[in-house]
Amino acid sequence: MEDYGQPDKLINLIKSMYKDSGGQILHKGKLTDFFAIVTGVRQGCLISPFLFLLAIDWILTRSTGDNTGIQWTLNSQLDDLDYADDLALLSHTRAQMQTKTDKLCENSAMVGLQVNIAKTKVMKSNTTSTEPIQIGNTQLEEVGKFVYLGSTVTQTGGTDEDVKARIYKARHTFANLHKVWSSKNIRVNTKLKIFNSNVKSILLYGSETWFLTKKLESKLQTFINKCLRRILNIFWPEVISNQSLWEKTKQPRISQQIKQRKFRWLGHTLRKDNDSIAKYALKWNPQGKRKRGRPKTTWRRQLTKELEALRLTLRGAESLAQDRRAWRNLVGGLCSATE
């Protein structure tokens, strides 16, 4: 806190809060003996999350910089992605990443924290380097994909692995609620509300950033249709068309719902200040040259086509998004249960 220019009075007050602190654990209705807490922040204290984030910021400020990140804007680089203690370091070269990792471990130790080697992974993209990244004498595991904040990130990019993971998790949740779907005491409308809040929310987590191909759309819609038929107790040889199924359950096509979520996120992002990280990411043009041949369809190119279908450009969408009501009407028109 001294490094951040906080007054001595405030620092001393916080120190006094932590002096001789301890705790007890309630186990089977009984309290354990009092024990001292000599590391970490106080559990349940309102100021604890702030102090922890301050420590993480202190560590990263001293572990990054020096042109070891990836080019982000004309005059700045992106060194890391952080959410609490879930950190993702970014570098162009193996040497830069090793230096950054060494600094992270060193600075973490200075505030009593330690990098979990077992949970730390390395992912390389578009490189021929085979030299490993190490922490001390331990070589970090290299992976082709990893999960960050619930979304699957792969070496080659794309959405396939993330969609596959979301379907798996949603299917598991749907199976755990089998007593709800088979119950004769719960109305269908109530079951559909439970499905939307407990299953569909898991399935569509992070879908705002998906690049949706026809194949992925088919996989998602097939899963949804199976769930809806189970909720309505429609089994073979009984038959119902997909259109009738959607109308009866008042469910939109999955592609339309994902587009609606994407445009809702787009509106929020376009209304942000120009120095917003999310807005930078939306308009970011990565470094490098693309390979010969037909350009690969990306989320950005797909968005451009969707905007063109609405007779909008990204600049025009940004202007329209400033009017929340107008943008809300646009988003509402993208999703129809009977389309």
Please report, for each region that a protein language model flagged, where it lies by residue.
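Short linear motifs embedded in intrinsically disordered, charge-biased segments
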Residues: 6-11, 16, 22-45, 49-339
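Conserved catalytic palm subdomain of right-hand nucleotidyl-transferase polymerases, strongest
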Residues: 1-2
